[in-house]
C-alpha cells in the first residue's frame, strides 16, 4: 500500500464547467477526441483546450498590467518554491492593513490568504462579492516587501471596484511581487508550508496556469 502523500494540491482542474471571470470573452473548454493512428490499430486520445491565461489557478506576471514588464517565462523557477505561510483572514469584505498587522509579516515571505472565498467554489457560479485585497492592504504588503501573494479566488482585486482591481495589481506586480490567483485552500489550515507552484512556460506571457501544491512544515 502506498503511503499517503503529505502534499496538498491547491490548484483547480481546468474544465468547461469551472468558474471564470465573467468579463473574459471566452469560457474555458477542454475537448477530447479519440482517433486511430494511421497505419495501425492503436487508438489514442488527444485533447484541445481553449483557455484564457487567467482561467483557473494561475500566476500573474508584471506584463499583465505593464506592457514592458517581465513576462511569465522570465519568472525565476524558484520564485514560488520554498517556505510559504497561509494566513486566515476573518474579514468577509477585504484584506486590510489592520488585520494584516496582527500577523507580523516579514520581508521576503510568501503569503497565501485563506478567506471565506474558499467556500465559494462550492456554489458553482461566480460570486461578485468575493474577499479581495484592499488598496491600503496592497500598499501594506508592498511596504513589507513580501515576495509572493496568493488568494483563494479569481483575482486579488475587487470585481465591483475596478479602480481597486487595477491599483492592487499595479502596486503588487509592479513591485516584483508574484501573484497566484484561484488557489484552493478549503482543506488547508493556517500555518507554515512548503510550496511548489510552477507556471506553464508561455513565451512573452502575461500569465499562465500553474499546478500549486503545499506540504506542511
Where in the sequence are the language-model features?
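Active-/binding-site microenvironments in catalytic and ligand-binding cores
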Residues: 1-217
Amino acid at each position: 500500500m502506498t503511503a499517503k502523500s503529505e502534499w496538498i494540491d491547491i490548484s483547480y482542474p481546468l474544465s468547461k464547467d469551472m468558474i471564470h471571470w465573467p468579463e473574459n470573452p471566452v469560457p474555458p473548454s477542454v475537448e477530447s477526441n479519440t482517433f486511430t493512428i494511421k497505419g495501425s490499430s492503436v487508438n489514442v486520445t488527444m485533447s484541445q483546450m481553449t483557455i484564457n491565461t487567467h482561467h483557473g489557478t494561475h500566476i500573474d506576471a508584471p506584463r499583465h498590467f505593464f506592457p514592458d514588464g517581465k513576462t511569465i517565462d522570465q519568472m525565476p523557477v524558484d520564485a514560488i518554491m520554498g517556505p510559504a505561510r497561509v494566513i486566515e483572514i476573518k474579514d468577509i469584505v477585504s484584506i486590510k492593513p489592520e488585520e494584516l498587522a496582527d500577523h507580523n509579516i516579514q520581508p521576503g515571505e510568501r503569503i497565501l490568504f485563506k478567506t471565506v472565498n474558499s467556500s465559494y467554489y462550492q456554489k458553482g457560479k461566480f460570486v461578485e462579492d468575493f474577499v479581495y485585497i484592499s488598496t491600503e492592504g496592497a500598499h501594506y504588503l508592498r511596504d513589507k516587501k513580501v515576495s509572493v501573494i496568493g488568494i483563494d479566488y479569481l483575482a486579488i482585486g475587487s470585481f465591483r471596484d475596478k479602480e481597486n482591481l487595477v491599483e492592487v495589481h499595479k502596486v503588487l506586480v509592479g513591485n516584483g511581487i508574484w501573484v497566484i490567483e484561484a488557489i484552493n485552500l478549503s482543506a488547508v489550515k493556517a500555518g507554515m508550508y512548503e510550496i511548489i507552484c510552477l507556471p506553464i512556460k508561455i513565451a512573452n506571457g502575461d500569465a499562465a496556469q500553474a499546478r500549486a501544491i503545499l506540504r506542511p512544515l
